[in-house]
From Swiss-Prot:
Belongs to the FPF1 family. Residues 16-36 are annotated as: Disordered. This is Flowering-promoting factor 1-like protein 3. It comes from the Eukaryota. Signal peptide: none annotated. It comes from Oryza sativa subsp. japonica. One of its GO terms (biological process) is regulation of flower development.
Length: 122
């Protein structure tokens, strides 16, 4: 796992190709130029909107907080975890995707947008 850890705007994240970070598009977060997507593994569904994300998180017992006007926040009573994402889906970046992956083990994963869909194991 190669890369550089970058601290920017109060967030620590791993950048695979630090030289291309400034020229990368908003959705890939510096991941080598390929666009990434968040995938709900059990269904194979790509999270293309916050409606999809919220539905899948609710299925797992996450509840939405309605207090912050700039963020969508989700909390699970059985843990101390808090998922925070920008209210504007166009600002949903790779660092937010990996935050969700870490806090919902084996339920979501980040894939290349062009990668073929993998059918869920039965």
């Amino acid at each position: 796992m190669a890369g550089v850890w970058v601290f920017k705007d109060g967030i620590v994240r791993r950048v695979e190709n630090p030289g291309s970070e400034e020229s990368s598009s908003a959705g890939d977060g510096g991941g080598g130029g390929r666009r990434k997507v968040l995938v709900h593994v059990p269904s194979g569904e790509v999270v293309a909107s916050y409606e999809v994300l919220e539905r899948r998180l609710r299925e797992l017992g996450w509840e939405r907080y309605l207090t912050d006007p700039c963020l969508l926040q989700f909390h699970q009573r059985s843990t101390v975890h808090l998922i925070s994402v920008p209210r504007d889906f166009s600002k949903f970046k790779l660092v937010h995707m990996y935050d969700i992956v870490v806090k919902t083990r084996n339920v979501f994963e980040v894939r290349d947008a062009a990668a073929p869909a993998v059918s869920p194991a039965t």
